[in-house]
């Protein structure tokens, strides 16, 4: 069993404060829980196991047992997980507060050791000092933490995580924060704790301490779309659905500027217990709009695109063609439920086809052309250099004419009404008959930016904001967007 989990189970019986702070779902009776998908460490009980999604941030960081308490490291309520979570710059005083908290709730002294030994020896055949029976006394104080970066803020969730070499399918990575403190002083504090243990347990304590205090920090892990669960969506079939978030709060709202001070609250047991009595939950409906999700969707489109359409004579939009084996696209993917992506695909293909028909002689969708290679890349607008190269390749294929050192192409083929509206919006209310390279690039960019302006999007969804930030955004009515009314970013 996990050392931290065992320590919480046994130490919660010491006093009333510990009974409140160290209550873990992993040590309670199992209740029905969401299906676990990913391997990693539960931030609540620190054991390596199958993880399920958190209802506070949609990340996979909680085990099936601990999920019953719905605790998130971004909560406002100062439960144990939140008090172990630090943010951004950590100074020596912050670390001192964490160490003091550990000493308060996980003390190792002669009285505590004798109490646990007497409890164990009451059981049959437990007179030996086996590690399995005294695992809870072998919890060293280390500065081992799991770290994650969210929108420029770096979070460190301290704890004692066993089996660091096991599989990790989460965006968290291990860091050693011992450099933020005095290494020799931390050694001394742990040796003081170790001296109260029986000799048979001291070696194991020392091994655990040094293995978790002398390791090399891991490389930061990149986040991807699959790090976030879809289970918080109000309607999973609706790509514009809001995410339902639950956060644990207290009546005395706390300032994020004092984020690293939470662990010091436990120093005043009376006030801490009064504060925890005021705990309640807040619920928010939050838009899932962000660069991470948008890039994932546009990447899928770039792989599904049927470039043959740009040479076709079909009278239908690109997504509506059904009877042509070269142009028919598989529109059964869930991604096409999003009207924004349908508009982007149809408009982009309509515009490119108009350019091709206006400037070349090729007129059938069964043709095999070199320009096909660059069509999929025109949807990956966030890769600026690659996108510019693709637009340039397409433009050069149209055999532009140079006038006064500026190259132009024609645009005299029929456009859809919607695409004409996009061009008029960009070109001062007109649909010009000739376009320069900059004009073509501006129009193709606008087709995507009108709905997904990735240049100004936040990297991750708003759901990973702190509780105070969610509260402020909700007050200003900025947690939702206007896409349900088919309003674009520009509108």
UniProtKB/Swiss-Prot annotation:
Superkingdom of this protein's organism: Viruses
One example of a Gene Ontology biological process annotation: symbiont-mediated suppression of host cytoplasmic pattern recognition receptor signaling pathway via inhibition of IRF3 activity
Motif (pLxIS motif): 485-488
Keyword field: Host cytoplasm, Host cytoskeleton, Host-virus interaction, Inhibition of host innate immune response by virus, Inhibition of host IRF3 by virus, Inhibition of host IRF7 by virus, Inhibition of host RLR pathway by virus, Interferon antiviral system evasion, Metal-binding, RNA-binding, Viral immunoevasion
Annotated stretches, region: RNA-binding: 1-81
Presence of the UniProt keyword Nucleotide-binding in the record: no
Cellular component per GO, a single term: host cytoskeleton
Region Important for cytoskeleton localization, annotated ranges: 82-176
Region (Zinc-binding domain): 42-79
Location in the cell: Host cytoplasm, Host cytoskeleton
UniProt-annotated stretches for the region Interaction with host IRF3: 320-491
Gene Ontology molecular-function annotations: metal ion binding; RNA binding
Main location: host cell
Family to which the UniProt record says this protein belongs: Belongs to the rotavirus NSP1 family.
Subunit structure: Interacts (via C-terminus) with host IRF3; this interaction leads to IRF3 degradation. Interacts with host IRF7; this interaction leads to IRF7 degradation. Interacts with host CUL1 and CUL3.
Domain free text: The integrity of the zinc-binding domain in NSP1 is important for degradation of host IRF3.
Protein name, entry field: Non-structural protein 1
